[in-house]
Amino acid sequence: MKNSLLSHQEKKIISFIKQYLNENGYPPTIREICQGVGLSSPSTVHHHLKNLESKGYLQRNPTKPRALELVAEKAPEELLSIPLLGNVAAGYPTLAIENAEEEMQIPKSLFPEKELFALRIKGDSMIEEGILPGDVIIVKKQEVAENGDIVVAYLEGEVTVKKFWKDSVNGVIKLIPANSKYEPIIINRETKILGKVIGLLRRY
């Protein structure tokens, strides 16, 4: 990880190594670096190379004369802004979804799906699934679910997060907590699935 500014001489060395690599296809020797940047002492070049390595700008093998490798610049992580809605009760379905209280940014590489929103958890009914009070869940908007999915549901004017289960025999749908202190909730036609939980963010 690059964590420090470069001195003027270090910039010259990096620039020379890049140019040499582009022209020759392999890195320069210590002596060639000396000549390229106007230094007379190989030990001085060794010192600068050691600093560049510690700062994360190159990797090298001191036992080989041309074993220099520049560390490529990493592209900035692409972020996706999604609405962060108010608290959702994981213990009792007590809070309705309001307008987004704010937006939050998440790594697009981890959550490539579209139509996402986030909810902050309160309550403890999903602790056995590792969803704790204060966690932020990432939810993919969808109105259908499969057995075992953790869903956000709109229930009697309020919102809750539970595990979805539909009985294959009688068609009864339950929202099941992941905490033995709570009973499953049998849902009716007025219940609406708002989305499926696909991720979780936690601050320590």
Curated annotation (Swiss-Prot):
Biological process according to GO: DNA repair; DNA replication; negative regulation of DNA-templated transcription; proteolysis; SOS response
Documented EC number(s): 3.4.21.88
Active-site residue numbers: 125, 162
Portion annotated as DNA-binding: 30-50
Swiss-Prot/TrEMBL catalytic activity: Hydrolysis of Ala-|-Gly bond in repressor LexA
Annotated site, Cleavage, chain positions: 90-91
GO terms for MF: DNA binding; serine-type endopeptidase activity
Xref: CDD domains: HTH_ARSR, S24_LexA-like
Keywords assigned by UniProt, alphabetized: Autocatalytic cleavage, DNA damage, DNA repair, DNA replication, DNA-binding, Hydrolase, Repressor, SOS response, Transcription, Transcription regulation
InterPro entries: ArsR-like_HTH (IPR011991), LexA (IPR006200), LexA-like (IPR039418), LexA/Signal_pep-like_sf (IPR036286), LexA_DNA-bd_dom (IPR006199), LexA_repressor (IPR050077), Peptidase_S24_LexA (IPR006197), Peptidase_S24_S26A/B/C (IPR015927)
PANTHER family given in the database record: LEXA REPRESSOR, LEXA REPRESSOR-RELATED
NCBIfam families found in the cross-reference section: lexA
Function summary: Represses a number of genes involved in the response to DNA damage (SOS response), including recA and lexA. In the presence of single-stranded DNA, RecA interacts with LexA causing an autocatalytic cleavage which disrupts the DNA-binding part of LexA, leading to derepression of the SOS regulon and eventually DNA repair.
Similarity annotation: Belongs to the peptidase S24 family.
Quaternary structure annotation from Swiss-Prot or TrEMBL: Homodimer.
Name of the protein in question: LexA repressor
